[in-house]
Amino acid sequence: MTLRAVVTGVGHYLPDRIVPNSEFEKTLDTNDEWIRARSGIERRHFAAEGETTASMAAAASRAALSMAGAEAQDVDAIIVATSTADLTFPSAATMVQAELGMTRGFAFDVQAVCAGFVFALSNANALILSGQARRVLVIGAEAFSRIMDWTDRSTCVLFGDGAGAVLLEAQDGTGTSADRGILSTDLNSDGRHKDLLYVDGGVSTGTTGYLRMQGNQVFRHAVEKLAATATTALERAGVSASDVDWVVPHQANIRIIQGTAKKLGVSMDRVVVTVQDHGNTSAASIPLALSVGHARGQIKQGDLVVTEAIGGGLAWGAVVLRW
């Protein structure tokens, strides 16, 4: 028998405040048509005062645990993928651990910006396969509205806040691609491109800073690298793009999503798209899309799913799993 890390629960949380594109017209030289044409985004959610990355992560986690019929005390580990932790330390994951009332196991954060959830899933898979954990909560949560430069129309209209979570559990499989669970992963980074997407603050500056992005350069890297990492992960799983039921990409920009699908040879009716409603929620975007796709009845048990993401660093990767 082969051990597999299987998704048994999924959930998400979105703040109540919905911000349509038209709201930016009041303060910026932009409009709804311009934003939609360049990104596919129509609206996004922003966290309220008092809402935090950790509180959103905990809410998404409760939904995932509920779906799985599990309690917080059943969980061995929590991994939170985020670039907007509430404090420098302790980690967002330990804050979630406390909020859920989990008094055992361990918790830590992963920071790979928009690729963070893919990196966190890979880490969780390794923990399960090595026998260090049997149940792992994997969460992507972000409050990007708090690192926006509201005078920069090229970035502030793109991002939103929210959280998504999955519960991974160890289950026995047959060792074939028919197994439920994570079948393969592929992770990459290249620090030579660190200046393409970054925040200009941190402990070295004594400021929180703002997100800065060379959008055209990021786009040029994104489609090529996303298609390549997805192809590598599919090959490692012993499957091909034609076998895939659903591509669940990082929801950064509809043009990147469409370009990557075309390069993979996958039609858009097999791609879960939520960018129009959520904007770019960075590490939260894939678990949000998984949860929404499942709730819509798109993603069903037994479906072959590939997720792929790229973020600042640059860091990029993909995970192939059977739901």
Curated annotation (Swiss-Prot):
Pathway(s) served: Lipid metabolism; fatty acid biosynthesis
Entry keyword set: Acyltransferase, Cytoplasm, Fatty acid biosynthesis, Fatty acid metabolism, Lipid biosynthesis, Lipid metabolism, Multifunctional enzyme, Transferase
Gene Ontology molecular function: 3-oxoacyl-[acyl-carrier-protein] synthase activity; beta-ketoacyl-acyl-carrier-protein synthase III activity
Subcellular location: Cytoplasm
Active site feature: C114, H250, N280
InterPro entries: ACP_syn_III_C, ACP_syn_III_N, FabH, Thiolase-like
GO biological process terms, semicolon-separated: fatty acid biosynthetic process; secondary metabolite biosynthetic process
Top class in the EC scheme: transferase
EC identifiers of the protein: 2.3.1.180
Catalyzed chemical reaction(s): malonyl-[ACP] + acetyl-CoA + H(+) = 3-oxobutanoyl-[ACP] + CO2 + CoA
A GO term from the CC aspect: cytoplasm
Pfam families: ACP_syn_III, ACP_syn_III_C
Region of interest (ACP-binding), ranges: 251-255
Known role: Catalyzes the condensation reaction of fatty acid synthesis by the addition to an acyl acceptor of two carbons from malonyl-ACP. Catalyzes the first condensation reaction which initiates fatty acid synthesis and may therefore play a role in governing the total rate of fatty acid production. Possesses both acetoacetyl-ACP synthase and acetyl transacylase activities. Its substrate specificity determines the biosynthesis of branched-chain and/or straight-chain of fatty acids.
Annotated family: Belongs to the thiolase-like superfamily. FabH family.
Entry's free-text remark on domains: The last Arg residue of the ACP-binding site is essential for the weak association between ACP/AcpP and FabH.
Subunit (UniProt): Homodimer.
Protein known as: Beta-ketoacyl-[acyl-carrier-protein] synthase III
Name of the gene encoding the protein in the UniProt record: fabH
